[in-house]
Amino acid sequence: MSIKDIITVPDETLKKISEPLEKVSTNEKKLINDLFETMYASNGIGLAAVQIGILKRILVIDVSTKDEKRKPLSFINPVITKVSTETSIYEEGCLSIPDTFIEIERPKICEVEYIDINGEKKNLKCDGLLSTCLQHEINHLDGKLIIDHLSKLKRDIIIKKISKTKKNPDRILV
């Protein structure tokens, strides 16, 4: 297992649609372990393969709190099959958009079909933070980011700020 670099906006890879997998091989299992290690090292609760530059429909999530035992979940080829009409609003952050938090309204409950790390088809119905995180990460697989919920002007301001920080990493932001 190894910690990978997380790509950030404005990297165009993040806007690409990830490809489904035909089967789960040793390489995909290693990738899932790398995603978990990278996510935990970055204090994240979810990470999609595209965020480390790999265009495969794989994502990992762990919404457990620091006081709880870890509850890692991995999803291969996840597809949202059903959502509730009731919605909830969470302030979402993203490891690919540093220091940015946006309130986003999403369906409160979602049902997902996916393949697990052992290649078995599974179904999951979830709500709360897990539902929000899963929808967020599946958006990544479809080339959508949380800033896509904003106006073009706000999006451009955030991307410009992040680009400046990349060019001047020692610059202090107040």
Language-model segment annotations:
Residues 1-174:
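Positively charged
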